[in-house]
Design a protein with these regions (language model features):
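Domain-scale activation on soluble regions of proteins
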Residues: 19, 68-70, 257, 312
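Amphipathic alpha-helical segments of tetratricopeptide repeats
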Residues: 16-17, 72-73, 261-262
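An aromatic- and glycine-enriched ligand-binding surface/loop that stacks and positions planar moieties
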Residues: 5, 9, 13, 30-192, ...
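Long, intrinsically disordered, low-complexity segments
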Residues: 7-9, 85-146, 153, 223, ...
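Flexible helix-coil transition and linker loops at the boundaries of alpha-helical arrays
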Residues: 18-29
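C-terminal substrate/ligand-recognition segments
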Residues: 158-262
């Protein structure tokens, strides 16, 4: 393993020395120096993690931190708009991306939009992911939100929830979503199992919003043109925070996590308080921030394995939400088991 890591790191380093910091014109979108250094930084972070570094060799964490610093020195910056950054190839936050255009587009929006719009609801978000988004005051959501007589159990959350997930009653592509079923159990909203193209409804009654171009028209000739982001500055900040924590520099770790939380506030100062924890509580905060900030960006699967926490977080019962619309228009919420997962440690590592 060490030999493989050394080879990969050396290849990325060589590439970074040959590539320019940016491309313009018809070459825009090609791999840059920043992309090579970012991939090197990710590789070194993985190599320093508990799965591959059981002795907690500090020199590996120091190498990961230094690699992240090399990327940060190139002048990238956090985009002010968390939702829109995934739609703009020119975002100052994007380090490595795959571009699309009118001729060579993709079907992401069709695959993941609601059945009521004509989509396939392919990414049905789990209740546990929805409830990973904090309340505005920084506390975690109370399960009682779904059993009390509330009109909106998703109100007052981390704004990243609304940029990442579509919940019942929220606007999506200009229309209020209807994941609910009527109390007769035979009819329901347009996005429910009784709605349009019922076979394509979301089994959890949530869908992904992140990466969606909500201005896309319902035409098979109109493919998605937004980029797929492989790496962005927020990941590098989180990589750096994690590495610095393990290097014993908790103040720096908190600083970089809080840069991300500041952006998540969307200009408000009264929500999502700064991370102030120390010790293992700080590490848990870093890991949690990574789960939320990088949700659906193909990190979590690898993160829980390199941290060796998969048997704690993935060996569980997972849920969706049923929403019943009463005759008076009020809605009743009930969580239901959708899947039971197992993870056998250490075999599955």
């Amino acid at each position: 393993y060490e030999e493989c890591v050394d080879f990969i790191v050396s290849e990325f380093q060589k590439a970074s020395e040959l590539l320019p910091e940016k491309f313009t014109g018809e070459n825009f979108g090609r791999v840059t120096k920043g992309a090579a250094l970012a991939m090197k930084a990710r590789m070194l972070l993985y190599a320093a993690s508990p799965l591959w570094n059981p002795s907690d060799d500090k020199s590996k964490w120091e190498a990961a931190a230094k690699a992240a610093e090399e990327v940060m020195a190139l002048g990238y910056s956090l985009d002010a708009d968390y939702k829109e950054l995934f739609l703009d190839p020119m975002s100052p936050e994007i380090i490595f991306q795959r571009l699309y255009n009118t001729e060579f587009g993709h079907w992401y929006d069709w695959y993941n939009s609601t059945n009521g719009w004509g989509g396939y609801s392919c990414t049905a978000v789990l209740q546990e992911m929805v409830d990973s988004y904090e309340m505005e005051d920084g506390t975690m959501p109370d399960p009682a939100l779904y059993t009390s007589a509330t009109t909106d159990p998703w109100a007052g959350r981390d704004p990243r929830l609304y940029a990442s997930v579509v919940c019942d009653g929220q606007l999506f592509r200009g229309t209020e979503t209807e994941f609910w079923v009527n109390s007769d159990g035979k009819t329901g909203g347009v996005d429910s199992e009784f709605g349009r193209d019922a076979w394509n409804y979301s089994k959890t009654h949530y869908i992904i919003r992140k990466f969606m171009d909500e201005n896309l028209t319902k035409s098979w000739s109109d493919k998605g043109k937004q980029p797929w982001v492989y790496c962005r500055l927020a990941e590098i900040y989180l990589n750096y925070a994690e590495a610095m924590y393990h290097c014993g520099k908790e103040d720096v770790a908190r600083e970089y996590v809080n840069y991300i939380r500041k952006r998540a506030r969307g200009g408000r100062e009264d929500i999502l308080p700064d991370v102030t924890e120390s010790g293992e509580a700080l590490l848990a905060k870093i890991q949690h921030e990574r789960k939320v900030e990088l949700a659906f960006e193909e990190h979590r699967f690898y993160d829980v394995r390199r941290w060796k926490i998969a048997e704690k977080v993935d060996k569980s019962v997972f849920h969706g939400i049923n929403i019943t619309k009463q005759a008076d228009g009020a809605k009743k919420y009930e969580l239901f088991e959708i899947q039971k997962r197992d993870f056998v440690a250490p075999a599955h590592y």
